[in-house]
């Protein structure tokens, strides 16, 4: 079994300029490396051994002038990583595949539509570029996502009720709903606002 992680919460504007994430109804302030770990896991399902490398790539994208290597801030990373789990800002499950992880984590989620202000679009650009997307392609986040039009009616429903369990219990095709939600999440159209319950296998 592999352990897969993703980020929880909705990035919020903060009057003091702090990095604020809302999980459920609670606002939580992130600082230092916490910010980069959270962003490295946002809109993706990442196997545990890949997380540190993704975070380093994100740091390189944001601070290209700094000399970063494979040992950069490892102790700080471990501390911040554990802290994010404790604070409910990242969640995990144990599955064999990324697809199984997406279904496991999303089925208990409450999701929210991404309201794409300039700050969020910039974060999406940084995350995409850090994951190896060519610069010109990463810039596409500043354009309207075609899938927002394709799934427009469903997204309007999400704005009223983001509880995934509700849609799974009121449809004859729950697997298709989960696949659609996974696609919308990984296309950076949805946030996971919170998770009601996650069963974690030991």
Model-derived features with residue positions:
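Short, amphipathic alpha-helical interface elements at domain boundaries
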Residues: 2-46
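Long, charge-rich, low-complexity alpha-helical segments
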Residues: 29-202
